[in-house]
Amino acid sequence: VARTLRGAVTGGLLPEGTRLPGHRRLAGALGVSRNTLVDALAGLEAEGYLRVQGRSGTVVCVPAAEAAGPLTAAQDLPLSAWASRALSGGVDDAGGEYAVDFRVGQPVPELYPEAAWTAALARQAGRLGRRTEEGKFSDPLGPLETRRALSAYLNAARGARVTPEMVMLTGGTQSALDALARVFLEPGRVAAVEDPTYPGARAALAATGAAVVPVAVDAGGLQPTHLPPQATLLYLTPGCQYPTGVTLGAARRAELVAWARRGNAFILEDDYAADLHHTGRPLPVMQGLAPDRVILLGSFSKSLAPATRSGFLVAPPPVLRVLARTRPLTDRAPGTLDALALADVLDSGAYGRHLRRARQVLAHRQEVLLAALSEGLPGWAVQGAASGLHVYVRLPAGLEEAQAVAAAARRGVALSPVAPLSATGGPAAVLLAFAHLPPEAIRHGVRRLASS
Protein backbone atom coordinates (compact mmCIF):
# COMPACT_ATOMS: atom_id res chain seq x y z
CA VAL A 1 0.00 0.00 0.00
CA ALA A 2 2.77 2.43 0.96
CA ARG A 3 4.67 1.64 -2.26
CA THR A 4 1.57 2.29 -4.38
CA LEU A 5 0.81 5.63 -2.74
CA ARG A 6 4.44 6.71 -2.75
CA GLY A 7 4.66 5.96 -6.47
CA ALA A 8 1.50 7.96 -7.11
CA VAL A 9 3.03 10.96 -5.35
CA THR A 10 6.47 10.79 -7.00
CA GLY A 11 4.90 10.06 -10.39
CA GLY A 12 2.64 13.10 -10.21
CA LEU A 13 -0.67 11.19 -10.03
CA LEU A 14 -1.26 12.71 -6.59
CA PRO A 15 0.02 16.32 -6.84
CA GLU A 16 1.10 18.27 -3.79
CA GLY A 17 -1.88 19.57 -1.82
CA THR A 18 -4.24 16.76 -2.82
CA ARG A 19 -6.53 15.79 0.09
CA LEU A 20 -6.92 12.02 0.50
CA PRO A 21 -10.35 10.43 1.04
CA GLY A 22 -11.31 9.21 4.51
CA HIS A 23 -9.66 6.05 5.83
CA ARG A 24 -12.69 3.78 5.37
CA ARG A 25 -13.31 4.95 1.79
CA LEU A 26 -9.62 4.82 0.77
CA ALA A 27 -9.16 1.36 2.32
CA GLY A 28 -12.12 0.10 0.32
CA ALA A 29 -10.76 1.60 -2.89
CA LEU A 30 -7.41 -0.07 -2.33
CA GLY A 31 -8.93 -3.38 -1.20
CA VAL A 32 -7.16 -3.49 2.17
CA SER A 33 -8.22 -3.38 5.79
CA ARG A 34 -8.47 -0.06 7.61
CA ASN A 35 -5.67 -1.08 10.02
CA THR A 36 -3.34 -1.87 7.11
CA LEU A 37 -4.09 1.49 5.53
CA VAL A 38 -3.49 3.36 8.79
CA ASP A 39 -0.06 1.71 9.18
CA ALA A 40 0.88 2.59 5.59
CA LEU A 41 -0.23 6.21 5.97
CA ALA A 42 1.74 6.57 9.20
CA GLY A 43 4.87 5.39 7.42
CA LEU A 44 4.34 7.81 4.52
CA GLU A 45 3.75 10.65 6.95
CA ALA A 46 7.06 9.85 8.66
CA GLU A 47 8.79 9.88 5.27
CA GLY A 48 7.31 13.29 4.49
CA TYR A 49 4.93 12.28 1.71
CA LEU A 50 1.77 13.04 3.71
CA ARG A 51 0.77 15.64 6.27
CA VAL A 52 -2.16 15.34 8.70
CA GLN A 53 -4.00 18.67 8.99
CA GLY A 54 -6.32 18.04 11.92
CA ARG A 55 -9.98 17.92 10.89
CA SER A 56 -9.02 18.81 7.28
CA GLY A 57 -7.73 15.28 6.80
CA THR A 58 -4.55 13.98 5.19
CA VAL A 59 -2.86 16.04 2.47
CA VAL A 60 -0.17 15.05 -0.04
CA CYS A 61 3.17 16.86 0.21
CA VAL A 62 6.38 16.26 -1.71
CA PRO A 63 9.62 15.87 0.30
CA ALA A 64 12.33 18.41 -0.49
CA ALA A 65 14.55 15.73 -2.04
CA GLU A 66 11.76 14.72 -4.44
CA ALA A 67 10.74 18.29 -5.20
CA ALA A 68 14.26 19.17 -6.24
CA GLY A 69 14.15 16.48 -8.91
CA PRO A 70 16.88 13.99 -9.85
CA LEU A 71 20.42 14.95 -10.79
CA THR A 72 20.39 14.82 -14.56
CA ALA A 73 23.72 16.31 -15.65
CA ALA A 74 27.29 16.82 -14.50
CA GLN A 75 26.63 20.51 -13.86
CA ASP A 76 24.22 19.47 -11.07
CA LEU A 77 27.11 17.89 -9.14
CA PRO A 78 29.51 19.67 -6.76
CA LEU A 79 32.51 18.69 -8.88
CA SER A 80 36.12 19.44 -8.01
CA ALA A 81 38.29 21.50 -10.33
CA TRP A 82 40.15 18.31 -11.29
CA ALA A 83 36.91 16.56 -12.36
CA SER A 84 35.75 19.60 -14.32
CA ARG A 85 39.04 19.75 -16.19
CA ALA A 86 38.95 15.99 -16.81
CA LEU A 87 35.44 16.21 -18.28
CA SER A 88 36.54 18.92 -20.68
CA GLY A 89 39.26 16.71 -22.20
CA GLY A 90 39.19 13.64 -24.43
CA VAL A 91 37.22 12.85 -27.56
CA ASP A 92 33.65 11.60 -27.74
CA ASP A 93 32.89 8.68 -30.05
CA ALA A 94 29.90 9.42 -32.26
CA GLY A 95 28.87 5.75 -32.21
CA GLY A 96 26.56 4.36 -34.87
CA GLU A 97 26.33 1.23 -36.99
CA TYR A 98 28.25 0.93 -40.25
CA ALA A 99 28.73 -1.66 -42.96
CA VAL A 100 32.50 -1.27 -42.60
CA ASP A 101 34.00 0.38 -39.53
CA PHE A 102 37.53 1.72 -40.04
CA ARG A 103 37.54 3.68 -36.75
CA VAL A 104 40.49 3.24 -34.41
CA GLY A 105 40.24 1.54 -31.03
CA GLN A 106 38.59 -1.68 -32.24
CA PRO A 107 39.47 -4.97 -30.50
CA VAL A 108 41.04 -7.74 -32.56
CA PRO A 109 39.58 -10.89 -30.95
CA GLU A 110 41.00 -13.37 -33.46
CA LEU A 111 44.53 -12.31 -32.50
CA TYR A 112 43.93 -12.94 -28.80
CA PRO A 113 46.11 -15.90 -27.67
CA GLU A 114 43.23 -17.45 -25.77
CA ALA A 115 44.72 -20.89 -25.18
CA ALA A 116 48.09 -19.62 -23.95
CA TRP A 117 46.59 -16.92 -21.73
CA THR A 118 43.95 -19.23 -20.23
CA ALA A 119 46.58 -21.87 -19.47
CA ALA A 120 48.81 -19.26 -17.81
CA LEU A 121 45.92 -17.99 -15.68
CA ALA A 122 45.07 -21.54 -14.60
CA ARG A 123 48.66 -22.34 -13.65
CA GLN A 124 49.09 -19.16 -11.65
CA ALA A 125 45.68 -19.43 -9.96
CA GLY A 126 46.76 -22.81 -8.63
CA ARG A 127 49.89 -21.23 -7.13
CA LEU A 128 48.21 -18.35 -5.32
CA GLY A 129 47.74 -20.27 -2.10
CA ARG A 130 51.39 -21.33 -2.06
CA ARG A 131 52.97 -17.90 -2.57
CA THR A 132 56.07 -17.06 -0.54
CA GLU A 133 56.99 -13.68 0.91
CA GLU A 134 58.92 -13.00 -2.31
CA GLY A 135 55.59 -12.57 -4.09
CA LYS A 136 54.51 -9.67 -1.87
CA PHE A 137 50.83 -9.45 -2.72
CA SER A 138 50.66 -5.92 -1.32
CA ASP A 139 53.73 -4.56 -3.11
CA PRO A 140 52.53 -1.41 -4.91
CA LEU A 141 55.06 -2.07 -7.66
CA GLY A 142 53.64 -5.52 -8.43
CA PRO A 143 54.98 -9.09 -8.00
CA LEU A 144 58.76 -9.26 -8.24
CA GLU A 145 58.77 -12.21 -10.64
CA THR A 146 56.64 -10.24 -13.12
CA ARG A 147 58.97 -7.27 -12.89
CA ARG A 148 61.91 -9.61 -13.50
CA ALA A 149 60.22 -11.12 -16.56
CA LEU A 150 59.34 -7.68 -17.92
CA SER A 151 62.86 -6.38 -17.37
CA ALA A 152 64.37 -9.29 -19.27
CA TYR A 153 61.87 -8.89 -22.11
CA LEU A 154 62.30 -5.12 -22.47
CA ASN A 155 66.09 -5.36 -22.39
CA ALA A 156 66.17 -8.07 -25.05
CA ALA A 157 63.31 -6.99 -27.32
CA ARG A 158 63.27 -3.20 -26.97
CA GLY A 159 66.85 -2.24 -26.15
CA ALA A 160 65.89 -0.89 -22.73
CA ARG A 161 68.17 -0.59 -19.69
CA VAL A 162 65.94 -1.91 -16.94
CA THR A 163 66.25 -3.71 -13.62
CA PRO A 164 63.25 -5.10 -11.72
CA GLU A 165 63.64 -2.29 -9.18
CA MET A 166 62.78 0.25 -11.92
CA VAL A 167 59.46 -1.36 -12.92
CA MET A 168 55.94 -0.68 -11.67
CA LEU A 169 53.00 -2.67 -13.02
CA THR A 170 49.93 -0.66 -14.01
CA GLY A 171 46.45 -1.17 -15.38
CA GLY A 172 47.59 0.31 -18.69
CA THR A 173 49.14 3.43 -20.13
CA GLN A 174 46.29 5.68 -19.05
CA SER A 175 46.62 4.79 -15.38
CA ALA A 176 50.38 5.34 -15.59
CA LEU A 177 49.84 8.77 -17.14
CA ASP A 178 47.40 9.71 -14.41
CA ALA A 179 49.81 8.65 -11.65
CA LEU A 180 52.73 10.55 -13.16
CA ALA A 181 50.66 13.66 -13.87
CA ARG A 182 49.49 13.81 -10.25
CA VAL A 183 53.07 13.46 -8.98
CA PHE A 184 54.73 16.03 -11.27
CA LEU A 185 52.08 18.54 -12.37
CA GLU A 186 49.92 21.21 -10.75
CA PRO A 187 48.51 24.63 -11.70
CA GLY A 188 51.36 26.88 -12.80
CA ARG A 189 53.48 24.07 -14.26
CA VAL A 190 53.87 23.19 -17.93
CA ALA A 191 53.68 19.90 -19.84
CA ALA A 192 54.33 19.38 -23.55
CA VAL A 193 52.70 16.92 -25.95
CA GLU A 194 53.05 16.08 -29.61
CA ASP A 195 50.50 17.68 -31.92
CA PRO A 196 48.50 15.75 -32.98
CA THR A 197 48.54 13.26 -30.12
CA TYR A 198 46.63 10.65 -28.15
CA PRO A 199 43.79 12.66 -26.53
CA GLY A 200 43.84 10.61 -23.33
CA ALA A 201 47.37 11.81 -22.61
CA ARG A 202 46.52 15.45 -23.18
CA ALA A 203 43.44 15.12 -20.96
CA ALA A 204 45.32 13.40 -18.11
CA LEU A 205 47.98 16.11 -18.05
CA ALA A 206 45.51 18.99 -18.38
CA ALA A 207 43.30 17.64 -15.57
CA THR A 208 46.00 18.59 -13.07
CA GLY A 209 45.60 22.26 -13.96
CA ALA A 210 48.98 22.43 -15.67
CA ALA A 211 49.34 24.24 -19.00
CA VAL A 212 49.65 21.68 -21.82
CA VAL A 213 51.65 23.01 -24.78
CA PRO A 214 51.23 21.30 -28.19
CA VAL A 215 54.46 20.80 -30.14
CA ALA A 216 54.24 20.31 -33.89
CA VAL A 217 55.04 16.96 -35.52
CA ASP A 218 56.46 16.72 -39.05
CA ALA A 219 57.68 13.81 -41.18
CA GLY A 220 60.56 13.30 -38.71
CA GLY A 221 58.40 13.33 -35.58
CA LEU A 222 58.25 15.97 -32.84
CA GLN A 223 60.28 19.11 -33.57
CA PRO A 224 62.62 19.72 -30.59
CA THR A 225 63.23 23.37 -31.46
CA HIS A 226 59.58 24.12 -30.65
CA LEU A 227 59.71 22.76 -27.09
CA PRO A 228 58.90 25.08 -24.18
CA PRO A 229 62.06 25.33 -22.03
CA GLN A 230 60.13 25.37 -18.75
CA ALA A 231 58.15 22.13 -19.24
CA THR A 232 58.26 19.53 -16.46
CA LEU A 233 56.99 16.62 -18.59
CA LEU A 234 56.99 15.77 -22.29
CA TYR A 235 54.64 13.05 -23.55
CA LEU A 236 56.05 11.33 -26.62
CA THR A 237 55.38 8.33 -28.93
CA PRO A 238 58.77 8.12 -30.69
CA GLY A 239 58.62 4.56 -32.03
CA CYS A 240 55.28 4.96 -33.81
CA GLN A 241 53.90 8.47 -33.41
CA TYR A 242 50.20 8.50 -32.64
CA PRO A 243 48.37 9.13 -34.88
CA THR A 244 50.72 9.87 -37.82
CA GLY A 245 52.81 6.70 -37.54
CA VAL A 246 56.15 8.46 -38.18
CA THR A 247 59.32 7.45 -36.32
CA LEU A 248 61.50 9.85 -34.33
CA GLY A 249 65.08 9.62 -35.60
CA ALA A 250 68.27 9.27 -33.55
CA ALA A 251 69.37 12.92 -33.87
CA ARG A 252 66.08 14.29 -32.53
CA ARG A 253 66.07 11.73 -29.74
CA ALA A 254 69.46 12.99 -28.61
CA GLU A 255 68.22 16.60 -28.77
CA LEU A 256 65.23 15.75 -26.58
CA VAL A 257 67.37 14.02 -23.97
CA ALA A 258 69.67 17.06 -23.83
CA TRP A 259 66.61 19.32 -23.44
CA ALA A 260 65.30 17.19 -20.55
CA ARG A 261 68.63 17.24 -18.74
CA ARG A 262 68.99 21.01 -19.11
CA GLY A 263 65.55 21.69 -17.67
CA ASN A 264 65.31 18.89 -15.06
CA ALA A 265 62.37 17.51 -17.05
CA PHE A 266 61.19 13.97 -17.75
CA ILE A 267 60.19 12.42 -21.06
CA LEU A 268 57.19 10.09 -20.87
CA GLU A 269 57.92 7.61 -23.66
CA ASP A 270 54.77 5.75 -24.70
CA ASP A 271 56.05 2.67 -26.55
CA TYR A 272 52.77 2.52 -28.44
CA ALA A 273 52.29 -0.54 -30.69
CA ALA A 274 56.02 -1.33 -30.73
CA ASP A 275 55.42 -5.06 -30.31
CA LEU A 276 53.24 -5.01 -33.43
CA HIS A 277 55.86 -3.43 -35.71
CA HIS A 278 55.60 -5.49 -38.87
CA THR A 279 58.04 -3.84 -41.31
CA GLY A 280 61.71 -4.27 -40.46
CA ARG A 281 63.02 -3.85 -36.93
CA PRO A 282 61.85 -0.91 -34.79
CA LEU A 283 64.33 1.48 -33.20
CA PRO A 284 65.22 0.74 -29.56
CA VAL A 285 63.33 2.69 -26.92
CA MET A 286 64.62 6.11 -25.86
CA GLN A 287 64.75 4.86 -22.27
CA GLY A 288 67.86 2.86 -23.19
CA LEU A 289 69.51 6.10 -24.27
CA ALA A 290 68.76 7.99 -21.04
CA PRO A 291 67.35 5.93 -18.15
CA ASP A 292 67.75 8.95 -15.87
CA ARG A 293 65.40 11.19 -17.89
CA VAL A 294 63.03 8.88 -19.78
CA ILE A 295 60.08 7.15 -18.12
CA LEU A 296 58.96 4.27 -20.33
CA LEU A 297 55.24 3.48 -20.53
CA GLY A 298 53.81 0.33 -22.06
CA SER A 299 50.70 -1.78 -22.26
CA PHE A 300 49.73 -5.24 -23.46
CA SER A 301 46.15 -4.21 -24.27
CA LYS A 302 46.95 -3.97 -28.00
CA SER A 303 49.25 -6.97 -28.32
CA LEU A 304 47.34 -9.35 -26.01
CA ALA A 305 43.79 -8.10 -25.40
CA PRO A 306 42.21 -5.04 -23.74
CA ALA A 307 40.60 -7.18 -21.04
CA THR A 308 43.98 -8.18 -19.59
CA ARG A 309 44.59 -4.59 -18.33
CA SER A 310 48.31 -5.32 -18.05
CA GLY A 311 50.69 -2.40 -18.37
CA PHE A 312 53.90 -1.07 -16.88
CA LEU A 313 56.10 1.94 -16.40
CA VAL A 314 59.88 2.00 -16.08
CA ALA A 315 61.30 4.96 -14.15
CA PRO A 316 64.51 6.06 -12.42
CA PRO A 317 64.62 4.70 -8.83
CA PRO A 318 63.93 8.09 -7.16
CA VAL A 319 60.76 8.49 -9.24
CA LEU A 320 59.68 4.93 -8.56
CA ARG A 321 60.09 5.41 -4.81
CA VAL A 322 57.68 8.35 -4.95
CA LEU A 323 55.18 6.36 -7.03
CA ALA A 324 55.38 3.43 -4.60
CA ARG A 325 54.47 5.80 -1.75
CA THR A 326 51.63 7.55 -3.59
CA ARG A 327 50.00 4.59 -5.36
CA PRO A 328 48.29 3.19 -2.23
CA LEU A 329 46.17 6.35 -2.15
CA THR A 330 44.35 5.11 -5.26
CA ASP A 331 44.53 1.35 -5.86
CA ARG A 332 47.23 0.03 -3.47
CA ALA A 333 48.63 -2.64 -5.84
CA PRO A 334 48.06 -4.17 -9.29
CA GLY A 335 46.04 -7.34 -9.78
CA THR A 336 48.22 -10.28 -8.80
CA LEU A 337 46.74 -13.03 -10.98
CA ASP A 338 46.99 -11.12 -14.27
CA ALA A 339 50.51 -10.01 -13.33
CA LEU A 340 51.65 -13.58 -12.67
CA ALA A 341 50.02 -14.81 -15.89
CA LEU A 342 51.91 -12.11 -17.80
CA ALA A 343 55.20 -13.31 -16.32
CA ASP A 344 54.21 -16.85 -17.32
CA VAL A 345 53.61 -16.04 -21.02
CA LEU A 346 56.76 -13.92 -21.19
CA ASP A 347 59.04 -16.52 -19.58
CA SER A 348 57.55 -19.49 -21.45
CA GLY A 349 57.97 -17.92 -24.89
CA ALA A 350 54.22 -18.02 -25.54
CA TYR A 351 54.08 -14.25 -25.96
CA GLY A 352 56.87 -14.25 -28.54
CA ARG A 353 55.15 -17.00 -30.56
CA HIS A 354 51.89 -15.07 -30.42
CA LEU A 355 53.59 -11.89 -31.66
CA ARG A 356 55.13 -13.64 -34.66
CA ARG A 357 51.70 -14.83 -35.77
CA ALA A 358 50.02 -11.49 -35.03
CA ARG A 359 52.61 -9.54 -37.02
CA GLN A 360 52.06 -11.76 -40.06
CA VAL A 361 48.30 -11.22 -39.92
CA LEU A 362 48.66 -7.47 -39.44
CA ALA A 363 51.21 -7.12 -42.23
CA HIS A 364 48.90 -8.93 -44.65
CA ARG A 365 45.86 -6.84 -43.70
CA GLN A 366 47.83 -3.64 -44.06
CA GLU A 367 49.09 -4.74 -47.48
CA VAL A 368 45.49 -5.35 -48.54
CA LEU A 369 44.46 -1.88 -47.33
CA LEU A 370 47.39 -0.11 -49.00
CA ALA A 371 46.75 -1.91 -52.30
CA ALA A 372 43.04 -1.10 -52.17
CA LEU A 373 43.71 2.58 -51.43
CA SER A 374 46.32 2.80 -54.19
CA GLU A 375 43.87 1.37 -56.72
CA GLY A 376 40.61 2.97 -55.60
CA LEU A 377 41.71 6.25 -54.01
CA PRO A 378 45.09 7.19 -55.51
CA GLY A 379 44.79 10.78 -54.26
CA TRP A 380 44.75 9.65 -50.62
CA ALA A 381 48.36 9.74 -49.37
CA VAL A 382 49.35 7.18 -46.72
CA GLN A 383 52.21 7.88 -44.29
CA GLY A 384 53.78 6.03 -41.37
CA ALA A 385 52.71 2.55 -42.45
CA ALA A 386 55.46 0.54 -40.74
CA SER A 387 53.66 -0.24 -37.50
CA GLY A 388 50.50 0.06 -35.51
CA LEU A 389 46.93 -0.96 -36.13
CA HIS A 390 45.88 1.89 -38.44
CA VAL A 391 47.18 4.09 -41.24
CA TYR A 392 47.24 7.89 -41.35
CA VAL A 393 45.93 9.20 -44.66
CA ARG A 394 46.32 12.76 -45.98
CA LEU A 395 43.29 13.79 -48.02
CA PRO A 396 43.56 15.34 -51.50
CA ALA A 397 43.66 19.12 -51.80
CA GLY A 398 40.17 20.58 -51.68
CA LEU A 399 38.64 17.69 -49.72
CA GLU A 400 37.84 18.76 -46.17
CA GLU A 401 38.15 16.27 -43.33
CA ALA A 402 34.56 16.67 -42.10
CA GLN A 403 33.32 16.40 -45.68
CA ALA A 404 35.20 13.12 -46.22
CA VAL A 405 33.97 11.60 -42.94
CA ALA A 406 30.35 12.58 -43.67
CA ALA A 407 30.48 11.29 -47.25
CA ALA A 408 31.91 7.98 -46.04
CA ALA A 409 29.18 7.67 -43.39
CA ARG A 410 26.50 8.08 -46.06
CA ARG A 411 28.03 5.06 -47.80
CA GLY A 412 28.02 3.06 -44.57
CA VAL A 413 31.74 3.46 -43.83
CA ALA A 414 33.13 4.91 -40.58
CA LEU A 415 36.44 6.80 -40.48
CA SER A 416 38.30 8.43 -37.59
CA PRO A 417 38.95 12.15 -38.15
CA VAL A 418 42.32 13.55 -37.10
CA ALA A 419 41.14 17.07 -36.19
CA PRO A 420 40.01 16.11 -32.63
CA LEU A 421 43.55 14.87 -31.93
CA SER A 422 45.16 18.24 -32.65
CA ALA A 423 45.10 21.42 -30.58
CA THR A 424 46.34 23.63 -33.40
CA GLY A 425 44.80 22.23 -36.57
CA GLY A 426 46.71 20.69 -39.43
CA PRO A 427 46.33 19.06 -42.81
CA ALA A 428 43.04 17.34 -43.60
CA ALA A 429 43.56 13.68 -42.72
CA VAL A 430 41.74 10.58 -41.50
CA LEU A 431 42.71 7.34 -39.78
CA LEU A 432 41.78 3.92 -41.14
CA ALA A 433 42.14 1.04 -38.69
CA PHE A 434 42.70 -2.29 -40.40
CA ALA A 435 43.77 -4.79 -37.72
CA HIS A 436 40.23 -5.90 -36.78
CA LEU A 437 38.95 -6.31 -40.35
CA PRO A 438 39.32 -9.38 -42.58
CA PRO A 439 40.80 -8.67 -46.02
CA GLU A 440 37.51 -8.80 -47.92
CA ALA A 441 35.90 -6.33 -45.52
CA ILE A 442 38.85 -3.98 -46.07
CA ARG A 443 38.48 -4.17 -49.85
CA HIS A 444 34.71 -3.72 -49.62
CA GLY A 445 35.12 -0.67 -47.38
CA VAL A 446 37.57 1.02 -49.74
CA ARG A 447 35.27 0.34 -52.71
CA ARG A 448 32.47 2.08 -50.83
CA LEU A 449 34.77 5.00 -50.01
CA ALA A 450 35.78 5.32 -53.65
CA SER A 451 32.12 5.61 -54.66
CA SER A 452 31.24 8.20 -52.00
What label would you give each PLM region?
Residues 317-322, 351-352, 398:
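Short helix-loop capping/hinge motifs at secondary-structure junctions, enriched
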Residues 1-123, 324, 328-335, 343-346, ...:
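N-terminal basic, amphipathic alpha-helical segments
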Residues 55, 288-322, 334-337:
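Active-site PLP attachment segment
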Residues 51-53, 162, 415:
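Short beta-strand "wing" residues that participate in macromolecule-binding interfaces
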Residues 150, 312, 340-348:
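Helix-loop "lid/cap" segments that line or gate small-molecule binding pockets
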